[in-house]
Swiss-Prot record:
The gene is tif32. The lineage of its organism: Eukaryota, Fungi, Dikarya, Ascomycota, Pezizomycotina. PANTHER family: EUKARYOTIC TRANSLATION INITIATION FACTOR 3 SUBUNIT A, EUKARYOTIC TRANSLATION INITIATION FACTOR 3, THETA SUBUNIT. Signal peptide: none annotated. This is Eukaryotic translation initiation factor 3 subunit A. PROSITE patterns: PCI.
Length: 1035
């Protein structure tokens, strides 16, 4: 069954617009809210949901329903964040714009109300001008109160300001920790900062900063979520840094110094996470705001350190820009005036650092000092310094960078007076004009008070070195400052008491005698200032206080030191051997050190290698452990995710089935109720109170309805028949009575129509006559203007004709020029096209010729290659033929040698030969044939017996040299199967005869010319010889 029609976004939007049109905006908002928060909305297309959400936020703003807007927008973000992020930004921007528009309208309304009240006040009637403020008016104003500006804003503007703040907070909560909506998040945060700055909302600004801080902390906590932001991404971190810098600027503008300091800490934390260095323009703003914060907190030491860092950054930017190594947008614009101003503030802030510690007392507890030390370490880290700054270090750094050349003259003179040539008796006279100049500058005026503290400290320190007691009047005369910055005696006494309390001064004030007595206790302890105090110390490292002479306490304290030095010098002069032994001991120590330096260096290098190896091993082990842990964690996470997905899928399936069943039941109940309501309202006479809805179905309801409708139809037909019959009688009676009065009525109507006609006719004639007279008078009045008008028209026509001719000729000339230019361009284009076409044809022709030439060259190369291959093949065939011939000859020689060898072996049993018997050919000892055929000797004897004398044996060729080794050359190895000489050559089994030669075989009788041995038969293991060759050999 399809869902109800109102579930579709288009139908919901249409229904809401209808409700708005009839003035039911709350009901429309309820419909839109139910649709936006419904689970069925998730399957709706985003394109159809966007108009619904735009109308929804508009109604939420009009009705100031922030919570409903938050619920709907959360649901819409969950629906659209995976498919279309742009629509979320559109809806949220619309939400913010509408809220801001409402605030603007409320302000305009408040201004209008206030202006109306102010304009109405002077016009009020006053009975007595001299007694305007009567007791009654005062009481009335106190009880009721007037419509003042604050009250108007509170009633009109403040609710919308609150709603706008809730809007910003809602949007930030919706967009937080989402990488796809990050840019919109940063933009909204900047808008919220501007809202707080524009309307001076300090409380909301604090809450906004805390909200953003929690979002960043939660980003690292929930980094495994889908679409979570990654602070390791440089672009994401840069956007957060930009937002924090804007937060810092707004905090400074609102003078919320604590929140500004927390913003500084946030920026420092983000900078520590950043892999890329921050831009100089951002760091310049960072140090400038940090200096202002330290100044407000009266932390002059770190204030001066921040100015020093700021000046270093300006110097670095100036050098970078002068060498064109960086872009101007990444560096602050630096001019000579800016450098002079920054240098002046660096030196002035360093001079204003108190010499007496303002944050330590004699009885300071250890834990308090530890907390202060931790605080200073944290401030040092914020400045990016390696160690805590001191007054002496800042002065030395300023002098090394040549700041005295850049500062303003009065600041340079003040430095010389206070730090170089301090004279207590004339200090105030010298400083007075300088303080006046500093006091005239609004930015430097705030340094006057700390400078006075420094001057007083210097004054009392040097007076204590010269005098034991001075008059109070004398001290008051010395401490005279310019009029706006005059110091009273009570302020001087307060300063003395503070210095005594902190342990930096030892002064007693006797008001009876009017004398200041400096402490002369020779056993008083040294007053070393705390190195980690927030205000720093002037006496650290270099001792910047000029020492006029030692005090009695210092003399007593250093007595043992002086005695030791004097005794040492005396021993050196009295006993020369003491000095010699000292020098020898020193030389021996140097020798030992030189001897052990090399070994120590090697040991150090070995230890370094061992340490590096251990570090690498530990690092590898740690990385392996981390990888294994990450793998296990990932596997476990995947398993949990899979289990969670499966569980959610099961739950979703069950919920879907239950929802479908419930929806079906709900729809069935709704249809039944709807049909019952239709029966109750449309069909009368049915009693449905006793019918149970659970037993009803659609068929039974339809049958009840049809029966009742049939009954009503019959009753209606009967009533209509009776009523028609009654009406017919009445109509006939009415018409019978009307016939008597029709003629009278017609005459009266004719008379009335004639009177109306005459009256309208007279009125029309009068209006026409008056109009005609007016037209004639107008004609006579305007006829005097006809000659002037004609001449003017003729003059204008001539001028316009001349101008037209000029323009026409100019247009013709321009047309001809453009025509010639066009013809020239066409000719040039055709010529260029022709040249390009010819070039293309020539290139094509050259390409074809090149291809043809390459084909011919390729064919020639192929023919040459074939010819060479044929020649090589012919040569190989010829060489093969030669080798075959040589092999045949070699085989023949070997067979002859084998035959001779065998004949020699066979002749051992024969009688010894005579000397007259000469062998002309070798005699072969042929193995007996295994087959049943006759041997060659028998065949030869048979031929002779047949009467044919045997042909003369050919002349024996000289016997080739006999090979004694077993090596056979390759050409003879494959072409001869003759056996090597006995005992020297291996005969394979396949070539051996089946039976060994018989030693008892009687060889044939010797003849002067024995026959040439024939080739062996195939059965004896020799090489196969073709038949034609056998016949040729037999012949």
């Amino acid at each position: 069954m399809p869902p109800p029609p109102h579930i579709k976004p288009e139908n919901v939007l249409k229904r809401a617009q209808e409700l708005i049109a009839v003035g039911q905006a709350p009901a429309a908002l309820t419909v839109l809210h139910e649709h936006a928060t419904s689970k069925r909305t998730r399957s709706s297309p985003i394109a159809s949901l966007e108009p619904v959400m735009l109308l929804f936020v508009e109604l939420c703003v009009d009705l100031r329903k922030g919570k409903a807007a938050k619920d709907g927008l959360y649901q819409y973000k969950n629906i659209a964040q995976n498919s279309n992020v742009g629509t979320i930004e559109i809806v949220l921007k619309k939400f913010i714009e509408l809220a801001e528009k409402k605030v603007t309208e409320a302000q305009a309304k408040a201004d209008e109300i206030q202006s109306s009240l102010e304009s109405a006040a002077p016009s009020s009637n006053v009975e007595d001008l001299e007694a305007i403020e009567t007791p009654e008016t005062i009481l009335l104003a106190t009880v009721s109160g007037e419509q003042s500006r604050d009250r108007t804003d509170r009633a009109v503007v403040t609710p919308w300001l609150k709603f706008l703040w809730e809007t910003y907070r809602t949007v930030l909560e919706i967009l937080k920790n989402n990488a796809r909506l990050e840019i919109m998040y940063q933009t909204t945060a900047l808008q919220a900062f501007q809202f707080c700055l524009k309307y001076t909302r300090k409380t909301e600004f604090r809450r906004l900063c805390e909200l953003l801080r929690n979002h960043v902390q939660n980003a690292a906590k929930y980094s495994a979520q889908m679409h979570a932001i990654n602070l390791s991404d440089p672009d994401t971190l840069q956007r957060h840094l930009d937002t924090r810098f804007q937060q810092l600027n707004v905090a400074v503008e609102l003078e919320l110094w604590q929140e500004a300091f927390r913003s500084i800490e946030d920026i420092h934390t983000l900078l520590s996470l950043s892999k890329r260095p921050a831009k100089n323009v951002m760091m310049a703003n960072y140090y400038e705001k940090l200096a202002r914060i330290f100044l407000v907190s009266e932390n002059y030491l770190f204030h001066a350190a921040a100015w020093s860092r700021y000046y270093n950054l300006l110097r670095q930017s100036a050098v970078t820009l002068s060498t064109n190594q960086g872009s101007k947008k990444d560096h602050p614009s630096v001019t000579e005036a800016d450098m002079t101003k920054a240098a002046s503030f660096v030196l002035l802030s360093a001079l204003a650092i108190p010499v007496i510690s303002t944050s330590r007392s004699r009885g300071a507890l250890i834990d308090v000092d530890e907390v202060r030390k931790n605080k200073n370490t944290r401030l040092t880290n914020l400045l990016g310094m390696l160690q805590s700054p001191t007054r002496a270090v800042l002065f030395r750094d300023a002098l090394n960078k040549g700041l005295l050349k850049r500062v303003r003259p009065e600041i340079r003179e003040l430095y010389n007076i206070l730090e170089v040539d301090f004279h207590p008796l004339s200090i105030c006279k010298k400083v007075t004009p300088i303080l006046k100049k500093i006091g005239d500058d609004p930015e430097m005026e705030k340094y006057v008070v700390p400078l006075q503290q420094v001057i007083l400290t210097r004054l009392f320190q040097q007076l204590s070195q010269v005098y034991e007691s001075v008059e109070l009047k004398f001290v008051y005369e010395l401490a005279q400052f310019p009029d706006p910055f005059q110091i009273t005696p009570s302020m001087i006494e307060k300063f003395i008491m503070n210095g005594c309390k902190k342990g930096d001064l030892a002064i007693r004030v006797d008001h009876i005698s009017g004398v200041l007595t400096f402490d002369t206790d020779v056993f008083s302890s040294a007053k070393a200032l705390h190195s980690g105090s927030a205000a720093g110390s002037a006496e650290s490292e270099l001792g910047s206080v000029q020492r006029l002479q030692n005090t009695p306490a210092e003399i007593a304290r250093l007595q043992l030191t002086r005695l030791a030095k004097t005794l040492h010098v005396t021993c050196m002069y009295v006993d020369p051997s003491y000095n010699d032994s000292r020098l020898q001991a020193k030389q021996a120590a140097l020798t030992r050190a030189a001897a052990g330096a090399a070994k120590e260096h090697e040991d150090t290098l070995e230890r370094r290698v061992i340490i590096e190896k251990k570090k690498e091993a530990a690092t590898d082990a740690l990385q392996r452990k981390q990888k294994e842990e990450e793998t296990r964690k990932r596997i476990r996470t995947q398993q949990l995710q899979e289990a969670e997905k499966q569980r959610l899928a099961e739950e979703q399936r069950e919920r879907e089935l239950k929802r479908i069943k419930d929806e079906q039941d709900r729809i069935r109940q709704q249809e039944l109720k709807k049909q019952l309501e239709e029966l109750k309202s449309g069909v009368k006479g049915i009693d449905l109170n006793e019918i149970d809805l659970e037993d009803l179905d659609a068929n039974r309801l339809r049958a009840i309805k049809l029966a009742q409708l049939e009954k009503e139809k019959n009753e209606l037909t009967e009533r209509v028949r009776a009523t028609g019959k009654r009406i017919d009688h009445l109509e006939r009676a009415f018409r019978r009575e009307e016939l008597k009065h029709i003629a009278e009525d017609y005459e009266a109507q004719k008379k009335v129509d004639m009177e109306i006609y005459e009256r309208q006719k007279a009125q029309t004639l009068a209006e026409a006559e008056a109009k005609h007279k007016e037209a004639v008078a107008l004609k006579h009045r305007l006829s005097r203007l006809i000659p002037v008008f004609s001449s003017f028209r003729k003059e204008v026509s001539e001028k316009r004709h001349e101008e037209f001719e000029k323009r026409r000729k100019a247009a013709e000339r321009e047309f001809e020029a453009k025509k010639k230019q066009r013809v020239k361009e066409v000719q040039e284009r055709r010529r260029r096209e022709k040249i390009e076409r010819e070039n293309a044809e020539r290139a094509k022709r050259e390409e074809e010729e090149r291809i043809k030439r390459e084909e011919e060259e390729r064919a020639a190369r192929d023919a040459e290659r074939r010819r060479i291959l044929a020649e090589e093949k012919a040569k190989r065939e010829e060489e093969r033929a030669k080798m075959d011939e040589i092999a045949a000859k070699q085989r023949q020689r070997e067979e002859e040698a084998e035959a001779r060898l065998r004949a020699k072996r066979a002749g051992l049993s024969e009688p010894p030969r005579t000397e007259s018997e000469v062998r002309t050919a070798p005699r072969l000892n042929i193995a007996p044939r295994t087959s049943g055929g006759p041997s060659w000797r028998e065949r030869q004897a048979a031929k002779e017996a047949a009467g044919g004398a045997a042909p003369e044996a050919p002349k024996a060729e000289p016997e080739p040299p006999r090979r004694t080794g077993g090596y056979v050359p390759p050409h003879a190895r494959g072409g001869s199967d003759a056996a090597p000489p006995a005992g020297n050559r291996y005969v394979p089994p396949s070539q051996r005869s089946s039976q060994p030669p018989s030693r008892t075989q009687t060889p044939p009788t010797s003849s002067p010319k024995p026959e040439e041995p024939k080739p062996l038969a195939s059965g004896t293991g020799g090489k196969w010889v073709p038949r034609w060759k056998q016949q040729q050999q037999n012949q």
